[in-house]
Amino acid sequence: MADRVRRPEYKHGVLVVYIAALFVQVLDATIVNVALPALAEEFAVSVTEVDAAAIAFSVALAVSIPPAGWLSDRYGSKTIFLGSLALFTAASALCGAAATLDQLVAFRILQGVGAGLITPVGSAMLFRAFPLEERAVAANAVLSVAVIAPAMGPVVGGAIVDNASWRWIFFINVPIGVVALVLGALWLRNDESAPAGRFDVPGFVLSSLGLAGVVFAVSIAPDVGWLDPLTLVCGLGGLAAFAVLVPLQLRLDNPLLHLGLFRERLFRTFNLVGIFFYAGFIGLLIVLTLYLQTHRGYSAFEAGLTQAPQAVGVFLLSNLAGRRLYRRFGPRPMFIGGTFGALVFTGVLVFVSASTPLWLIGAFMFLRGVSVGTVFLPMQTAIYSNIADAQLSRA
């Protein structure tokens, strides 16, 4: 009886641990951006130069995602999940202690590797733990964290930068990460999965070159220009690597990337659309926060507060969607309606000017959050709805 009190049902244990890990990972993606001016001042460089730390994180995260499924199948999902969370947590502490910009960039690379493994391995564990009919509930809980945490990042980061040291935007990850590690060690288990087979080295090299090239090109283009030689070389080089990678992966019996999964219509559609949707969601948070600080003179905390209404909108609609709308209408109408609303209110925010009051920006952010909250639940649930449990780690 005592053991039953201490240990939750397995699926709930997976949910708690994954949500905690996802929270610090997603929070970190936006909490750092509000501190870029403070980091530039600390290291006596421009904001553009400090952005190298963010670019390093993004590239490392992208490169570490493709091998996540193979590593999970080969060494066990619990082992890889806790190992990646430990790496992310330790790297967060090192980032907070960084004495130079070069050190910060190096430690952000380690952070990115850990972060890139957490989400695919953790989400596969979660959807294996929940039966198909309960996955909408699990997806709703994950959604609340995945969308609210980025909106909280600028608020929390702004408060930290204005009232403490920038180092705490990294140190804040450590206690949450440690708690998640302890609970994960107690509650998680290695799932059964398909045999890992041999590691696809050519696939890993090509996917790394492709992802690193494209992510790096997209990251630097706003500063140096889309036609800059470096942007073109990296971007086109990355696309060329993908052009070689795709037919190679389709020919192999045990590829690193199981591209055959994209034959499943829902998986293909929601993955491809979701890439652009989430990029736009995070991108506006970053741009708006920096604009309010550097062009309108608001403090980091004030700039971060403009993101709070969006978090409220997401929370309200994601919970309503989870309980009623998804059961009644299914994923397609919700996704189309929410996407239309998100596009409209994102477009409105593009025209924010020096005379636009903060309350109006906040109102549009709330409406954008309402739209986004309607989209992410059906997208998250439908992606894995027709994928066999044995293939979830590769999906």
PLM feature spans:
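Hydrophobic transmembrane-helix bundles of small-molecule transporters
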Residues: 162-273, 280, 298, 306
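Structural signature of transmembrane alpha-helices in multi-pass secondary transporters
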Residues: 25, 54-57, 61, 88, ...
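12-transmembrane solute porter fold
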Residues: 12-34, 47-57, 67-69, 202, ...
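Helix-loop-helix hairpins in multi-pass membrane proteins, especially solute transporters
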Residues: 65-203, 355, 389
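Hydrophobic alpha-helical interface/terminus motif in multipass membrane transporters
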Residues: 36-39, 122-126, 160, 188, ...
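Transmembrane-helix signature of multi-pass solute transporters
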Residues: 87-97, 114, 176-183, 210, ...
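Helix-boundary and loop/linker segments of multi-pass membrane transporters
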Residues: 3-11, 96, 196, 224, ...
